[in-house]
Structure formats: structure tokens, C-alpha cells
């Protein structure tokens, strides 16, 4: 699928916290396209709620530019037991563990772009107020550090109040969820 609609978001990612809202049909290919483009020239810390670390690493040839925090599989999925630039989180509801893992990854990749692949999935595991506080504190911390965060959310995957709160903490929101995607429509 062509992801031309992501060009603006990719061009303006440095130094800001941004939220990209997609529809379900766009989600997978858009996240994969974004990761592939970002790791070409940037270090990326990828917080995965939807894929194993092994699957995330398989999406790119630029493995040295990628650090994965795997909240999806909760334990190693690498067949050879090697865990390159990977931290596993055993409980997705433990937002403190996720923050500690991000802090460790930032020590290794200080100027990395941080990519959350699915805020909707993360919000399911957490109390609403704790989730909002986590996003607020994390966004503020990254602003102070001059960091870059890209949150992905699927339209309808989280309640409107939480989504509205996340939007408030982001410098830029891209809502591509209503776009007509010709290649997807033709495939059906």
C-alpha cells in the first residue's frame, strides 16, 4: 500500500510529540512503512503492543538503528535466544516498567525517535486515569529532553475522552482515519 499520506508526518517528526490516527485497514502497512523510513536515517525505540520483537526486527534491514521494547510477547521469541536491543515487559498494565525500559533504551539511543505502535492496546490494560497520567508525564519528559515521540492509534480503539487527552499532550495530531485508500479498496 502506498503511504503518501504519511509524508508530512515523517517530514516533521523531529523534536515533537505527535499522534497519528489511522483506520484499521491502514494500520499495519502504515506502521511498517513508518518504521522502515525512520530507521533509514534515525535511531528508533519501538514500543510494540502488536508484534513480537522478532517480528519488528524482521520489518527492517537497519537492525542496528532499532531498539524494541516488546510488550506483546512478554518473553523472548528469538529462535536462537539472541536478544539484540530488546527489553521484554511481562505485564502491559505496569506502565512504570514500560517507562523504565524506555529510559534504558534512551541511554543506548539518546537521540532516538520513540514510536508507540498502538496506544489503543496499551489503554486497554491500564486504568484510564493512570494511562492519561503516564502519557502526560512521558510527553512532558520528552519535551524537556527535546525528544521525538510518535504515537499511533487506531480510530475507535480507545474511548474518546482518552484520545482527547492524548491529543492535548501532543504537539501535532494527524488524523488519516477517514482517507480513501484506493489500493485497499481495490483489493476487496
Where in this protein do the model-derived segments appear?
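Glycan-processing catalytic domains of CAZymes
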Residues: 32, 107, 131, 161-162
